[in-house]
């Protein structure tokens, strides 16, 4: 019904505006999976240009701009489709995935942000540089729970679209592939092994993490404050 949403928009927004115009569609929502560290988002400028609502998952952080702080499981109508927010803390505390459900009620795609990559999961040591009482161990434990309680129970045919691929500093073992089925990730992603205990997951996730770039915390604060 000529309604569109943008997930995690880049800083340069004109391509989104042009594509929406080309397809005679109105950008209704800007869904952010988390407060990004590796780039400055175009969410504020895109909202000003289109009137779209900026949406984040549950967070205690107060944004410097108007945004809808959604609850876990909250749904948004987009034409005949439904977008359901799934709160998946771990990479950051507000990290959320967006589940796309078609007009027949079938779950079609999961936009996972930095929670689940192809071949990897998000590093759990970034938010601790912004929120003092967080540790990478606590975040890794949250991520384990999010993966096992929120994502892995979803059906295997679901298409996973992460925010990054190989080369990003937000993970350590990302594939060059940009999408995959959830079922294949359950079989091949080291972090989703059923035999992996929470303690083993935390240890394995933290091994080999290099220090994040120094500008990451600055980007987070810019994305929160506007």
Locations of regions flagged by a protein language model:
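Active-site neighborhood of phospho(di)ester-bond hydrolases with catalytic His/Asp-centered motifs
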Residues: 6-7, 27-36, 55-58, 87-90, ...
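Active-site metal-binding motif and surrounding structural segment of the metallo-beta-lactamase
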Residues: 11-55
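Conserved beta-strand hairpin/beta-sheet module of binuclear metal-dependent hydrolase folds
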Residues: 1-26, 98-113, 118-119
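Short acidic-hydrophobic, aromatic-tinged amphipathic segments that line or gate anion-handling sites
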Residues: 68-72
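Active-site environment of divalent metal-dependent phosphoester hydrolases
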Residues: 13-14, 35-40, 61-64, 93-94, ...
């Amino acid at each position: 019904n000529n309604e569109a949403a943008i997930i995690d928009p880049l800083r340069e927004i004109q391509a989104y505006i042009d594509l929406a115009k080309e397809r005679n569609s109105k950008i209704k929502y800007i869904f952010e999976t988390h407060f990004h560290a590796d780039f400055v988002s175009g969410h504020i400028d895109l909202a000003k240009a289109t009137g779209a609502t900026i949406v984040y998952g549950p967070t205690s952080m107060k944004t410097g701009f108007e945004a809808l702080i959604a609850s876990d499981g909250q749904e948004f109508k987009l034409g005949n489709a439904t977008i359901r927010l799934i709160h998946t803390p771990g990479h950051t505390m507000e990290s959320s995935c967006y589940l796309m459900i078609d007009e027949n009620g079938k779950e079609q795609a999961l936009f996972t942000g930095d929670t689940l990559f192809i071949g990897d999961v998000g590093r759990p040591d970034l938010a601790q540089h912004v929120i003092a009482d967080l540790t990478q161990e606590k975040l890794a434990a949250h991520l384990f729970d999010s993966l096992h309680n929120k994502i892995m129970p979803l059906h295997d045919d679901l298409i996973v679209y992460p925010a990054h691929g190989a080369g990003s500093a937000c993970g350590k073992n990302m594939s060059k592939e940009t999408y995959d089925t959830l079922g294949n990730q359950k079989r091949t992603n080291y972090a989703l092994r059923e035999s992996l205990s929470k303690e083993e997951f935390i240890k394995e996730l933290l091994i080999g993490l290099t220090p994040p770039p120094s500008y990451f915390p600055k980007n987070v604060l810019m994305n929160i404050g506007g």
